[in-house]
Structure formats: structure tokens, C-alpha cells
């Protein structure tokens, strides 16, 4: 819980700096937090069959925050670049899906494969962390490829709401 108390506000500040907009900064956090909550619920299933380390919730939070924000950042940044270049809403979303969507998929699969290696360590803590990490990465990846484009489509230009004037020049 202590790590989350530090990581969440810090992530929000960084995202505000990067995007210069409150709504654009909150979208990646929303996706990451949703992935964390979903994974914390889903971890109950494997915990019926294998021991789950008591620190798994912290691992899920920190990894989920990292990949959830990262995957959203790829997508949202690309969609905003396309809009700034004059593309319409749908064309911008399609371009983001074709480029950033593919990057999210490849990145997510790579992390899943790498984390699967810990399953063979023989150490119960590593196995537990591997399962939690793989689950949160998969949930964040699926959310980034499905929920995020739908959310951006629904938000449209409102993703720019809450612009922070002095940050406008930095993004």
C-alpha cells in the first residue's frame, strides 16, 4: 500500500507534464488502475491451486501501473499526434491502432514470455510473482487494445479538457 501511495501521485504528475491535460493524464491511470483491480480479483483463481505470496498485491499494483500507463501512453500519444496532423477522429484512432496497437501487443507478449520463465525457478515466491505479473500484463494489454480505443472514441476532443496553460508548450 505504501508503494501505491507514492507511485500513483507521481505517475499522475508525470502524465500531467507529458500531456498537459487533466483528462489525457487520467485516461492512462484509469486503465492501469482498472487492470490492477481486475487482476487482484482474478488472482483468487490460481491462489486456489498454488500458494500466492502475501506481497503479490504490491507487485500487481506496481507492474500494473507501469504497463497500464506505458501501453496507454503509446496509444494516446499516437492518436493525439494524428489529430494534430489534421486527421479526423476515426482516422487518428485507426492509425494509432495500426501502429501503437501492434507495439502494445508485441510488448505485452514479450513481457508475458519473459515472466513465464520465473514459473520454472522452483521458488514459490517467484512463481507467485510470475503469475501475478503475467495476469496484470495480460489484463492491461487487453484493456489497451479494446477499452482504450473505445474510450478515446467516446471522449473525442474532450480528451484535451483540463489543459494546463503553462504545460501546453511542453507537450
Predicted stretch roles:
Residues 1-171:
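Membrane-embedded transmembrane helical bundles of large multi-pass transporters/channels
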